[in-house]
Regions:
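Alpha-solenoid helical repeat scaffolds
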Residues: 1-143, 150, 155-162, 318-319, ...
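Long internal repeat-built scaffold domains in very large eukaryotic proteins
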Residues: 1, 166-438, 524, 528-617
Length: 617
């Protein structure tokens, strides 16, 4: 579009008039009067579209003027400067220096302009090229609602979403579907169900193939959006044996999400036309673990299996024969599975539904773990009889032994996670803790110790007496354990204090103040992560009125004002919220804060005085 004056003879009278007006309005672009600047830039934006060619000198002059107007103090001038510049950008040759300069200027306004209407003007008018897309996607987190909505209404409607990376698609949908404003959520849903679905040949499975169903969260939210917008989809799904026999990851994900949607909205009657009976479901789950499906990648096979188990978790087990078949299959799977946490957890959730009650569930899982431990012990006896064993084989067998131990601990952890009642009536759990969990807590392998401490913590949540008995172990881990174990154990200590209180947990300790002393040590000087976690815990205890100690409050106030906490953003954010919330909760809390502030003025000023003297010297 940028050509010389040799084509003036081919211009129509209207185009010649527009060119003359353009040259006239250029003179007012930098006028002192804001109204003149506004009208001149506005009219230039209108005229640029009607000119087939612009002289090179005029083009460069106009480009420089408009770029300067992008920084005009009046936002309305900047808006029309954006419109004019985006239209002028289309006249520049691709890859030219002028085009690059205009692109950089527009992107800078898109990212940093303080007025939302200016950012929105750039967003709506700039050409959504591959180079520009990352900056457009950033606006899905803009603070202005209309700007966030504009991302899904204008530029994304012109883009083939297949040019985006999967993580960008996920991020765009996540920001839109989870937005706090309903209009943004609606715009994102319309983009997904309209433009994106059309580019997928109106096939929901093809659309899921272009999303990361393994992540689950965003794809699940997208399907929920489809089910809400188009309820007829629910009636269109039917049971097809061929599909279940050779199930794909996307189809399994669709059926599992559909099942959860029906249960969530009390539409379980629609499941009969989609799901087979329990015995048939057990058959298909067994088929996924057989050799017939070994051509699939291990991760894909594991994902499909988890979807099947998610469907089975919500099934109706009124059919006794089907329930027994599923119970037998789940028991076999727990024995054959490796230490994969997600699969074990999925099987456990099905077992909870199948078993009569929690006592039956606990007894069943403990028996399975005992069988696994007995098989391990028998295998070790047989191996011990062999002599002349190679060193490499010993290392391999030791690794296998650790894997089997981890599997047993993972099963125990998942069992405790699914329990809601007290452990006092259970006769099998104490033996499991003594024979498996407590020895594993001192195992040389770090991962084994971590899972064992987690198991013990989950068990203590369910039994106050057990928590008091094992509190000394948690305190020991916090003081002398590995950093990751310290964090884990300290979280457990705070959880138990929140559940049962200091007094109930101190009955088995030689020093009844040991728990509080440990917490005070952790919230003082020490490793940053431990200190931050301890401050979070103490703040929660004070807010919940479970800790009534003026010294603890004094420590938090002093820590907030101490220079050493300046670089710890999480710590300062926690204390900023705590000090405001604590003072407003009750009048007595306000008095306590005032007392600390008045009587500890010297302690508050001392670190800053010391710092000033050091700098002066």
């Amino acid at each position: 579009m940028q050509e010389g004056e040799d084509e003036d003879e081919d211009e129509t009278p209207s185009q010649q008039l527009a060119y003359s007006l353009l040259q006239h309005y250029i003179q007012g672009v930098e006028a002192k009067d804001r109204t003149v600047r506004y009208r001149c830039v506005q009219l230039i934006a209108l005229l640029v579209n009607h000119l087939p060619a612009i002289d090179d000198e005029v083009f460069v002059e106009l480009k420089d003027l408009l770029i300067r107007r992008l920084h005009d103090k009046e936002s309305v001038v900047r808006v029309h400067a954006v419109v004019a510049l985006t239209r002028l950008q289309g006249a520049a040759e691709e890859g030219s220096e002028e085009g690059q300069e205009m692109f950089r200027a527009l992107v800078e306004r898109l990212k940093h302009d303080p007025q939302a209407e200016v950012r929105r003007a750039v967003l709506i008018n700039i050409e959504p090229t591959t180079r520009c897309l990352p900056y457009i996607l950033e606006r899905s987190r803009d603070q202005d609602t209309l700007t966030r909505r504009a991302v899904y209404l204008r530029p994304m409607e012109e883009v083939d979403f297949r040019v985006l990376k999967i993580r960008d698609r996920e991020s765009l949908l996540d920001h839109g579907l989870e937005d706090r404003d309903a209009s943004v959520r609606r715009a994102c849903a319309n983009l997904l169900s309209g433009h994106w679905l059309h580019l997928s040949d109106d096939d929901l499975i093809k659309l899921l193939e272009r999303l990361d169903v393994g992540n689950g969260k965003v794809a699940s939210k997208a399907l929920e959006t489809f089910f809400d917008l188009y309820p007829d989809i629910l009636s269109g799904l039917t049971y097809e044996e061929a599909t279940w026999t050779a199930m794909k990851a996307e189809h399994a994900f669709l059926i599992r999400t559909f099942t959860e949607h029906c249960h969530r909205h009390d539409q379980t009657s629609k499941l009969d036309q989609v799901l087979p009976d329990i015995s048939t479901q057990a058959y298909f789950i067994r088929n996924e673990t057989g050799e017939e499906r070994q051509e699939l990648v291990a991760d894909e096979l594991s994902f499909i299996l988890r979807q099947f188990l998610g469907i089975a978790r919500l099934a109706d087990y009124s059919d006794e024969m089907g329930r027994r078949n599923m119970f037998t299959l789940m028991r076999q799977m727990l024995i054959k599975l490796g230490p994969e946490e997600e699969l074990i957890r999925a099987v456990m959730e099905v077992m909870v539904r199948i078993c009569v009650d929690e006592r039956d569930f606990t007894q069943t899982i403990v028996e399975i773990i005992s069988d696994l431990r007995e098989e391990e012990g028998g295998g070790e006896d047989e191996k011990g009889e062999e002599e002349g064993e190679e060193e490499g084989n010993k290392e391999t067998k030791e690794t296998e032994k650790v894997h089997r131990l981890l599997k047993s601990l993972e099963m125990a952890r998942c069992m405790f996670e699914n329990l809601r009642g007290s452990l006092q009536q259970s006769t099998s759990v104490p033996g499991l803790l003594q024979e498996l969990v407590l020895p594993a807590a001192v195992h040389p392998h770090l991962e084994v110790r971590e899972v064992a401490v987690t198991c013990l913590g989950l068990a203590c949540y369910l039994d106050k007496r057990l928590a008091a008995q094992r509190m000394e172990l948690f305190l020991h881990v916090v003081r002398y354990g590995h950093l990751e174990l310290q964090i884990m154990a300290l979280k457990i200590v705070f959880d138990l204090v929140m559940l049962f209180g200091f007094q109930a947990l101190s009955t088995s300790l030689e020093d009844p103040h040991e728990i509080f002393r440990l917490i005070a040590d952790c919230s003082g000087e020490g490793e940053t992560t431990i200190q931050t976690l301890a401050v979070h815990g103490v703040s929660k205890l004070l807010l919940a009125d479970l800790l009534d100690d003026q010294q603890a409050l004094k420590s938090l106030v002093l820590l907030y004002f101490h220079p050493s906490s300046t670089d710890n953003a999480r710590l300062r954010q926690c204390l900023s919220f705590f000090l405001q919330a604590f003072g407003r909760m009750a009048y007595k809390n306000h008095d306590r804060l005032c007392e600390v502030s008045l009587y500890e003025r010297g302690s508050l000023l001392l670190p800053y005085l010391s710092l000033s003297v050091t700098i002066f010297l």
